[in-house]
Amino acid sequence: MNPLRPADLHHLRAAEGWLELGNEAEARGELDQISTNRLDHPDVLEISWMLFAKEQNWNACVKAAELLVQQAPERPGGWIHRSFALHELKRTEEAFINLNPVRRIFSDQWVIPYNLACYLTQLGRIKEAARELHTALKIDPRAVKRAAVNDPDLEPLCKHIDELRSG
């Protein structure tokens, strides 16, 4: 993939900055100024996905992530983002099916087994979820513990673990 032209890169960085500041309207305005033929660039798709996620436009998130997977399958973000958006759309089985095959390709990414654990928990597959969470903990225990503390997707798994401890 060719690098972005300086003007497009400027708008992309500005959009990213506006997103970090919580100003989605300005971020959208910057993205709108990027050349039309560069909207499928992986870096643009990543920032577009972030904007759509802030807006909770999960259908647009799925589309952006699918394009990202097509344009840059070597990047874990597209795979992770697509499944996250599918899960937000209550298409959790599909989220799991799409993310599970790349877990070995991106074995250094704790968020993949973590998200798989969330999806499996929501699907009622608690034992498999526990294995995935254990895998995530081996990769980055601090990040996983921070993410898991208040994650409602893992509540059924936590209850199961508590029951095992007490009983």
Describe the function of each predicted region:
Residues P42-D43, P76-G77, W110-P113, K138-N150:
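Boundary/linker segments of alpha-helical solenoid repeat arrays
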Residues P3, N37, Q71, R104-F106, ...:
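Structural marker of alpha-solenoid helical repeat scaffolds
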Residues M1, D140-G167:
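Terminal, low-structured helical/coil segments at or just beyond the last alpha-helical repeat
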Residues L4-K54:
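Alpha-helical segment of the N-proximal tetratricopeptide repeat
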Residues D43-V111:
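Alpha-helical adaptor scaffolds
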Residues L9, R13, I47, H81, ...:
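"A position-specific structural signal for the A-helix of alpha-solenoid helical repeats
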Residues T121-V144:
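TPR/TPR-like (Sel1-like) alpha-helical repeat modules
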Residues E20-L21, K54, E88, Q122, ...:
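Register position in tetratricopeptide repeats
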